[in-house]
């Protein structure tokens, strides 16, 4: 065993920096918190190279003297606290005195600052070493430039994901800061392009929140938000009604004392209030709460994202109840005009140009299928929703079918497949009834069509036989800037899946082509892209998993809906299609496609 030695200060600093600064988004978060703590009401942000080349934050806050400027990059130097007891009454974001020290250890850092009426000064620090201190223009405020992040820690640099992904995290930090600090105006540029411009509040809290939500969540969601307030915990929230749930779960924001936080307790409380929602639909919300610093703890980790409450059950119950009352009460959306992120498209019939590949020759359902919104809530007949599924850890499992009236759920390819069989009709326009030699067989027409479309799409995609349908007019889809970055990560793969997209602006994408196996209406296509942007947000997911999720979602939403009439020819064709499937007994989500009732069971039921 080697001898124990004390690490050099520069090595220890780089190791410690990894706890505070994990990626560019962590740097930006610390710089924005410092700017807000300094009393700034205008913050300008420039990002180049996804934050690896440059992160610049300029503010008009109180600024620093020369002495404070040189101390700002020294470890555990802070103006926020003086002793341990101060941790119980914090009203600032930063407090550890580690942020700038950690940033300086793994980058080339420069800080220019001046107090009102004082002289300006600039320091340069590289790899934790002070290079110079020099005069600078005496403009009140502070400008921090972080260049070549992780240049001296290649392992950390290698750990970073693609530029699109890192940019999406950076923009998420800005979105959170902008919602938390309505009195501050923000101007954000990435690689020279203006992405966000938020004007400072004129004192109208609701109006400012809705206007900022219009840029971040999208105008359509923002105008539907319900406003609710309660004196307890200084509670103010903006929630989508049950009729306006979204296909993604990342349009959710919690703030306590203006600090953005993640909390399973808070998230589960809100989801509990939305009980009965289809499991593939999620609320969008912005929740503000205030409470004494001693009643909650964010000092669990240097990132200060997770929170623990002194009275967790009380907070959970309060949030669940007040949200439930808002959803079931007479609350109305806030009546505020929202300027759309991009000019509205001209109203037109959604049409296709000539397809690039032949239309599929086998169309058992013809062209008269009702074209519903592909993300309309699934019928409750097809989905059993628990009171609450953890929105963070939930993974859909095959539903355990109920055995009602002695019916047997088919789980493997049985003799029930064998002919002859005769279509008798449908039950509630949802379940197809067939007579077989063994008895009765009931098929869930929605789940069956879902399975057929799922396998047909996968097969065509894997065999490179997927037909592409170019759109006569591109469809514009507005998204949060962070979601646009996520979606563009998968642009090339989406092309192989039949979807051709391109970025039109920092918050808008264009859809130029779709797979010809699906027939979209414009609204349906827009909602699909919004949902897709949420699903592909995590680049750690393998492309195979992404394919399955994408195909399952499309197949489910474009299958025959419950309550649709099916002719005898269509019913017979559907059964033939199911027999050709690798797994004709289950929908892609694991739910059963059919149940059977044998002649013997019928005889027993009638006591014969």
From Swiss-Prot:
Superkingdom of source: Bacteria
Database matches in Pfam families: DNA_mis_repair, HATPase_c_3, MutL_C
Organism encoding this protein: Elusimicrobium minutum (strain Pei191)
Keyword Coiled coil: no
Function: This protein is involved in the repair of mismatches in DNA. It is required for dam-dependent methyl-directed DNA mismatch repair. May act as a 'molecular matchmaker', a protein that promotes the formation of a stable complex between two or more DNA-binding proteins in an ATP-dependent manner without itself being part of a final effector complex.
Keyword Ribonucleoprotein attached: no
HAMAP family: DNA_mis_repair
PROSITE patterns in UniProt: DNA_MISMATCH_REPAIR_1
Keywords, in A-Z order: DNA damage, DNA repair
CDD domains: HATPase_MutL-MLH-PMS-like (cd16926), MutL_Trans (cd00782)
Entry-linked InterPro entries: DNA_mismatch_repair_CS, DNA_mismatch_repair_MutL, DNA_mismatch_S5_2-like, HATPase_C_sf, MutL/Mlh/PMS, MutL/Mlh/Pms-like, MutL_C, MutL_C_dimsub
Family note: Belongs to the DNA mismatch repair MutL/HexB family.
Lineage per the UniProt record: Bacteria, Pseudomonadati, Elusimicrobiota, Elusimicrobia, Elusimicrobiales
GO biological process: mismatch repair
GO cellular component entries: mismatch repair complex
GO molecular function per UniProt: ATP binding; ATP hydrolysis activity; ATP-dependent DNA damage sensor activity; mismatched DNA binding
Protein name (database record): DNA mismatch repair protein MutL
């Amino acid at each position: 065993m080697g001898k124990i030695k004390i690490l050099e200060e520069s090595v220890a600093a780089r190791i410690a920096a990894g706890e505070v600064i994990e990626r560019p988004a962590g740097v930006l978060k610390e710089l924005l918190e410092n700017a807000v703590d300094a009393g700034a009401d205008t913050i300008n942000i420039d990002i180049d190279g996804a934050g690896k080349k440059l992160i610049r934050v300029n503010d008009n806050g109180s600024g620093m003297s020369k002495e404070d400027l040189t101390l700002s990059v020294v470890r555990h130097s802070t103006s926020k606290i003086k002793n341990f007891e101060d941790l119980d009454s914090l009203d600032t974001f930063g407090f550890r005195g580690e942020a700038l020290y950690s940033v300086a250890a793994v980058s080339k850092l420069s800080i220019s600052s001046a107090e009102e009426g004082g002289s300006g000064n600039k320091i340069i620090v590289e790899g934790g070493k002070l290079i110079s201190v020099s005069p600078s223009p005496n403009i009140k405020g502070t400008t921090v430039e972080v260049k070549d992040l992780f240049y001296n820690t290649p392992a950390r640099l290698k750990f970073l994901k693609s530029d699109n992904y890192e940019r999406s995290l950076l923009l998420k930090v800005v979105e959170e800061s902008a919602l938390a600090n309505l009195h501050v105006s923000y101007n954000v540029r990435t690689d020279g392009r203006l992405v966000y411009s938020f004007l400072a509040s004129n004192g109208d809290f609701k109006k400012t929140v809705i206007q900022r939500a219009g840029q971040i969540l999208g105008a359509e969601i923002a105008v539907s938000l319900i406003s609710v307030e309660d004196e307890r915990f200084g509670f103010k929230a903006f929630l989508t009604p049950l009729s306006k749930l979204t296909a993604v779960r990342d349009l959710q924001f919690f703030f306590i004392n203006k600090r953005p936080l993640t909390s399973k307790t808070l998230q589960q409380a809100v989801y509990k209030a939305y009980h009965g929602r289809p499991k593939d639909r999620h609320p969008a919300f912005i929740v503000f709460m205030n409470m004494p610093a001693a009643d909650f703890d964010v000092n669990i980790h240097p990132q200060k994202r997770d929170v623990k409450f002194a009275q967790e059950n009380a907070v959970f119950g309060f949030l669940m109840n007040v949200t439930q009352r808002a959803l079931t009460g007479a609350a109305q959306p806030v009546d505020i005009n929202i300027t759309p992120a991009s000019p509205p498209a001209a109203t037109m019939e959604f049409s296709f140009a000539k397809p690039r590949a032949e239309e599929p020759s086998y169309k058992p359902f013809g062209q008269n299928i009702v074209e519903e919104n592909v993300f309309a809530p699934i019928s409750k007949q097809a989905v059993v929703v628990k009171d609450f599924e953890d929105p963070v850890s939930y993974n859909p499992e095959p539903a355990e079918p109920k055995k009602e009236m002695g019916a047997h759920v088919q789980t493997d390819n049985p003799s029930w497949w064998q002919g002859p069989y005769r279509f008798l009709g449908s039950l509630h326009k949802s379940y197809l009834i067939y007579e077989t030699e063994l008895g009765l067989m009931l098929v869930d027409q929605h789940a069956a069509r879902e399975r057929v479309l799922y396998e047909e799409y996968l097969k065509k995609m894997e065999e490179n036989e997927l037909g592409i349908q170019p759109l006569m007019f591109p469809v514009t889809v507005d998204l949060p800037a962070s979601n646009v970055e996520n979606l563009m990560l998968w642009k090339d793969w989406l092309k192989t899946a039949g979807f051709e997209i391109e970025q039109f602006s920092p918050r808008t994408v264009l859809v130029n082509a779709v797979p010809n196996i699906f027939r979209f209406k414009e609204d349906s296509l827009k909602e699909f892209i919004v949902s897709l942007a949420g699903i592909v947000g995590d680049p750690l997911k393998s492309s195979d998993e992404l394919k399955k999720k994408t195909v399952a979602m499309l197949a489910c939403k474009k299958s025959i809906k419950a309550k649709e009439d099916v002719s005898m020819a269509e019913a017979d064709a559907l059964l033939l299609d199911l027999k050709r499937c690798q797994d004709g007994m289950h929908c892609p989500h694991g739910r059963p496609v059919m149940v059977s009732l044998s002649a013997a069971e019928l005889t027993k039921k009638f006591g014969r």
